[in-house]
Amino acid sequence: MIKRIGKIVLIIILGSLVFITGKFLLVWKSVEIDHSLSQKPIFKAFNQQKQATLWSQKGEDSKTNDFKITSDSTSFEYYSCYINRNPTLNITFSVGDGFSGGGYQIDILQNRYKVSPYSYTDNIKPFDFLNTGEYYKVLDSKVVLDKESYQKGDSIFGYTELKIQEGYGPRKYIAEGKGYFKGKVN
């Protein structure tokens, strides 16, 4: 009886591992590596340009990206780029007014990536933690980086393209974006 229970537990554990590995390989796509990416003239042009932010319309910081999104319902928007490492490499393209906003997040783990939309707000309501978020489906995406791995403090150069369906039914729309980005890994 104990051997039979042990076999069942072992089968459940192995089945779970196979399922998790399969889901990782299906959902997380491979990152393309282009070692010459950092030599592109667009990155040198970023150093000459200033990026306006919510707090400074003149722009005091050097431009970090030219990523922009177009969708069925709005004209293009320019995004800010933030790069963090904890334990996955997280690249966030964000637009907002300081109180609420959103954008797209690219999580990279061992040369595989996953794209997802995200949003934030300072108007938190009771039971917001139960909200699973808006429906989305990544129709197409591509991420190109200049190196295989990064540590905190490293410079990162990259390019991304994405096509995401957000919502469904009459509220469905397609958002498409692409652009180069650079920065330091925080």
Q: Which ranges hold each PLM region?
A:
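Short, Lys/Arg-rich N-terminal segment immediately upstream of the first membrane anchor
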Residues: M1-G6
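Targeting-peptide/extracellular-domain and disordered-appendage signature
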Residues: K23-L26, K58-E60
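Surface-exposed helix/loop patches within compact recognition domains
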Residues: T53-K152
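C-terminal or internal capping secondary-structure element at the end of a domain, subdomain, or sheet
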Residues: D146-N186
